């Protein structure tokens, strides 16, 4: 079993390749084990998928529940894991930094902090201060913990691409290791973002269906995630199987 430090170095090298590696999103221990066995080199948690596995909605998970979930996934897998850490479970920059330190203790090697509070977008200055605090906390850790900064404006329909790019550039300057703007819906937008920043970029692929990994790699995208889509596929399949069982009486 690789150590946390070894996993962190592996995770860092995956991003440095800028070769659009897929990082699927498990929602529980079983799905994490399945995805590792399938051959993926790293995993990313999904806040929505985890919440729904507990019968709740996205954003209804406590910090302690999130940390326990991350500890579980780390304990049943041997590959790097990064975490959808939502808003860092705090509004205050200092508290976000403290929570990043707690997150690292679960065995994961990265995490994301977004500029959405679950009710409103943080203003530009506050959003940057939060990323800076998270980056400072990450830098103090004994491993190369990779901090992803998320600009949520497209996903929440509160900002245009120019606003997103301004935030991503500021997050990069504040110390983020990876940049992420969920909601980019075409390759032109992805290319525009890549042309404005220098840090590795994550793309959420369900917004760009039918586009190959190779096409993203040619642009220089570092990482591809699927969010809660895999969890959604499993839930849909379960519903269809259940309906068939009730309708036909045959399994």
Task: List where the protein language model places each region.
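Alpha/beta enzyme core
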Residues: 2-83, 87-228, 232-240
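C-terminal segments
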Residues: 239-250
